A protein has these predicted regions:
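N-terminal alpha-helical targeting/anchoring segments
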Residues: 1-135, 153, 157
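TRNA-recognition modules of translation machinery and tRNA-sensing kinases, especially anticodon-binding
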Residues: 27, 129-424
Length: 424
C-alpha cells in the first residue's frame, strides 16, 4: 500500500496517478486519508502531552508528601486519575483512527509510474515490440480444443464431470507436454540464477493482504471459509510472503525465486468465445518469478525479467508481442507492467501468457519487507514478479501454431523434455 509519507509529501501527484488508473473518487479518498491521519496524529499529540503530565505529577506527589503538602499531593493524585481516565478514551480513539486509516489505505491502488501511458483498457496498451514468425497454417487449421480432442490430449468434458467447467483433464502426450513445459521453464529460471521454491497453494488472509490480492480480489479468489484460507491465484502470493515482517541485509539483495504451482481463479463473469478451451481456466499451471531488490536496482531487475520471458518465447518458436499496459488496464498493485502475448493463428487472436510487473514499495510496505543498508538504516524493498510462463495459452499456441498434416510438431527446445518430436 501507499505510505502516508508518499501521500502527504506528494498529494497532488498521488491523486493524478490514481486518476490515471481510473480509481473512482481519487481526490475524495485521499482527502479522507489525510483527514483520518490528522485525527490520529492530533489524538497522539494530546495523549503524549497527557502522559508527560502524568509522569511529572507522579514524580511530584512523593515530594509533596515529604514536604507535608498533603492537600497539594491529593490534588495531584486526583489530576493523575482524571488524566488516566481521559487517556483510556484517547487511546481507544487513536487506535480506531489507526485502524480506519489502515483499512482505507488497503482500498487504494498503487500509483503508476510516469512512463505508464494514459488509457482506459486493453485497446489503449502500447505495443513495445513484436518477435517470432507468424505461422502459415492450412485453411482447415483447427483451434486447440479440436486438436486436443483429435489427438486425445485434453478432455474438457471429463473435467466438467469431475469438477466443472474450467478444470480440464490432461491425458497421455497432453500431460507429458504440460510436464515438459514446467520442467523447461524451471530449468531456464535456474540457469538465470533463480532459486526454486515449492510453496503451499493455500494461504491465510494475512498473505493475501500482504501482496495486495485482498481486499481487492476477494470475489475472484477461492475461499475455504471453514479454515479461512484462500487458494492462490499465482505463486506470487506465498513466495513474496516468505519475506513478510523480515529485515534483509543489503548484501542479500537481489533475491531471485521461482516457483511452479497450480493456480486458482474464479474468473466470475467470464463467458463467450474468448474463454473456450484453454483460453481461460479456473485451475492452471504456472511458473512464477519473484524478485526483491533495492529501489535503485529495480528498473534493471524488471528489464532482466522481461528479457528472460522473451527468451522463453523465442526458444518455443512462438510469435509474440510485448505490451506496455496503460493505466486503466494495470493491476491494482502494479506501478509498471508489461504483458506478453502469443499469436494464435488458428483463432486469429493474441493470447496473454505473462504479465511482468514492478510494484515499487507498494507490496513491501504492506509486507513490512525491508532491508538494512550499510549505514544501518532500514528501507523498504522493491518487489517484482512475472509469469515465466503461464501454461494453458502456451499449450494452446503450441498446438495451434505447430499443427501439420502429419501431426503437431514439438519445438526443438522441448524435445529433450517431452521425449518425442511429434504428436500424431
Amino acid at each position: 500500500m501507499l505510505t502516508i509519507k508518499q501521500i502527504t509529501d506528494n498529494t497532488d501527484a498521488v491523486i493524478r496517478g490514481l486518476e490515471k488508473k481510473h480509481f473512482k473518487n481519487a481526490k475524495e479518498t485521499i482527502e479522507q486519508v489525510l483527514e483520518t491521519n490528522n485525527k490520529r496524529r492530533n489524538t497522539q499529540t494530546i495523549l503524549d502531552k497527557n502522559l508527560s503530565e502524568v509522569n511529572s505529577l507522579s514524580k511530584s506527589i512523593g515530594m509533596l508528601m515529604k514536604e507535608g503538602k498533603k492537600d497539594e499531593a491529593e490534588t495531584a493524585k486526583n489530576r493523575v486519575a482524571e488524566l488516566k481516565e481521559a487517556n483510556k478514551a484517547l487511546q481507544e480513539e487513536m487506535d480506531q483512527a489507526a485502524t480506519d486509516l489502515q483499512n482505507l489505505l488497503y482500498t487504494i491502488p498503487n500509483v503508476p509510474y510516469d512512463s505508464v501511458p494514459e488509457g482506459v483498457g486493453a485497446d489503449d496498451n502500447v505495443v513495445e515490440k513484436m518477435g517470432g514468425m507468424e505461422t502459415e497454417l492450412p485453411k482447415d487449421a483447427l483451434p486447440h480444443w479440436e486438436l486436443a480432442k483429435k489427438y486425445d490430449l485434453i478432455d474438457f468434458d471429463l473435467g466438467v464431470k469431475i469438477t466443472g467447467a474450467g478444470f480440464p483433464v490432461y491425458k497421455g502426450k497432453g500431460a507429458q507436454l504440460q510436464r515438459a513445459l514446467i520442467n523447461f521453464f524451471l530449468d531456464e529460471a535456474r540457469k538465470s540464477g533463480y532459486t526454486e521454491i515449492m510453496p503451499p497453494t493455500v494461504v491465510n488472509a494475512a498473505s493475501g493482504y500482504g501482496t495486495g490480492q485482498l481486499p481487492d480480489k476477494e470475489g475472484q479468489m477461492y475461499h475455504c471459509e471453514v479454515d479461512d484460507l484462500y487458494l492462490i491465484p499465482t505463486a506470487e502470493v506465498p513466495v513474496t510472503n516468505i519475506y513478510r515482517d523480515v529485515i534483509l541485509d543489503e548484501k542479500q539483495l537481489p533475491i531471485k525465486n521461482c516457483a511452479y504451482t497450480q493456480c486458482f481463479r474464479r474468473e466470475a463473469g467470464s463467458y463467450g468465445k474468448d474463454v473456450r478451451g484453454l483460453n481461460r481456466l479456473h485451475e492452471f499451471s504456472n511458473v512464477e518469478l519473484v524478485r526483491i531488490d533495492k529501489p535503485e536496482h529495480s528498473k534493471e531487475s524488471h528489464q532482466e525479467m522481461l528479457n528472460h520471458v522473451e527468451g522463453l518465447l523465442q526458444k518455443l518458436e512462438l510469435p509474440y508481442r510485448i505490451l506496455r499496459l496503460c493505466g486503466g488496464d494495470m493491476s491494482f498493485t502494479a506501478a509498471l507492467c508489461f504483458d506478453f502475448e502469443v499469436y494464435s493463428e488458428a483463432q486469429k487472436r493474441w493470447l496473454e501468457v505473462s504479465s511482468v510487473s514492478n510494484f515499487d514499495t507498494y507490496q513491501a510496505n504492506r509486507l513490512k519487507c525491508r532491508y538494512r543498508t550499510a549505514e544501518k538504516k532500514t528501507e523498504l524493498c522493491h518487489t517484482l514478479n512475472g509469469s515465466a510462463l503461464a501454461l494453458p495459452r502456451i499449450v494452446a499456441a503450441l498446438l495451434e501454431n505447430n499443427q501439420t498434416p502429419e501431426g503437431i510438431r514439438i519445438p526443438k527446445a522441448l524435445v529433450p523434455y517431452t521425449g518425442f518430436e511429434m504428436i500424431d
